[in-house]
């Protein structure tokens, strides 16, 4: 099996009973798909860590090389790609803690490193180049993102799309008005288009498998229906803009009239 197949299976089992969120306390909860992915990937990462520890003991080494991946959170970017002793993995990388190495949502792992035999996968020069590259920002819709910020934005968009898919399906199951169902489906397609454009602009691979964990099948409307909906939305937006402009003009005219009357009153008082 692969990670995505396992996540889809577990999410399907949990949501089949009607479960939609997982509460971690009175003030914090996550959607089922978010909680499942975090739990499974974190657990598999920790299992890999235990295997690396066993291999390190067998090889007689206390040093390990942490792997590197793009878009690492800032706290992890400082130590990824480097060689550390096991104690340093704990003290510097936070091994064994939630926010540290192999903690919540951490995608890093580490492998035994034998001094004098092993060759580093990531040189300091290469790491320095990547650090500068990852810090570069790209503008989208008036906001700038570095690599980490862009990946976080991707995750937010994926979560929002899963929620929209669920909304569309629940409206259908609840036999809501056809227009409401269509509107929900078209909004989902619009979000998908935005996700595609954002990913292309940021030069990040799309991870649509994260969107389809729900196993809900096709939610997007036909191309013809979507284009018709887009035209309707554009027309509504144009009408709203025109109404807003008319309101602004009216307010401006009313203010001008008040100013004119105030000037006339002031002139009469000085006669």
Task: Put a short name on every predicted segment.
Residues 1-98, 116-271:
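Domain-core detector
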Residues 95-114:
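C-terminal edge-of-domain segments
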């Amino acid at each position: 099996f692969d990670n995505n197949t396992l996540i889809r299976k577990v999410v399907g089992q949990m949501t089949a009973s009607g479960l939609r969120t997982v509460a971690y306390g009175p003030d914090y909860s996550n959607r089922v798909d978010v909680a499942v992915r975090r739990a499974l990937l974190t657990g598999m990462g920790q299992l890999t860590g235990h295997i690396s520890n066993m291999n390190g003991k067998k090889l007689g080494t206390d040093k390990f090389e942490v792997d590197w991946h793009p878009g690492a959170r800032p706290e992890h970017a400082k130590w990824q790609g480097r060689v550390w002793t096991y104690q340093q993995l704990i003290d510097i990388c936070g091994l064994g803690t939630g926010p540290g190495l192999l903690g919540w949502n951490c995608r890093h792992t580490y492998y035994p490193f034998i001094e004098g035999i092993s060759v580093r996968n990531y040189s300091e020069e290469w790491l320095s180049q990547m650090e500068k590259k990852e810090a570069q920002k790209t503008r989208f819709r008036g906001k700038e993102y570095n690599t980490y910020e862009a990946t976080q934005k991707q995750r937010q968009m994926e979560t929002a799309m899963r929620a929209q898919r669920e909304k569309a399906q629940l409206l259908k199951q609840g036999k809501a008005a056809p227009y409401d169902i269509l509107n929900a489906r078209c909004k989902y397609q619009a979000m998908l288009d935005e996700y595609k454009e954002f990913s292309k602009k940021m030069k990040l691979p799309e991870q649509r498998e994260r969107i389809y964990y729900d196993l809900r099948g096709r939610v997007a409307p036909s191309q013809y229906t979507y284009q018709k909906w887009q035209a309707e939305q554009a027309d509504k937006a144009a009408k709203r803009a025109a109404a807003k402009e008319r309101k602004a003009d009216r307010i401006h005219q009313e203010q001008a009239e008040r100013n004119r009357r105030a000037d006339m009153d002031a002139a009469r008082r000085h006669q």
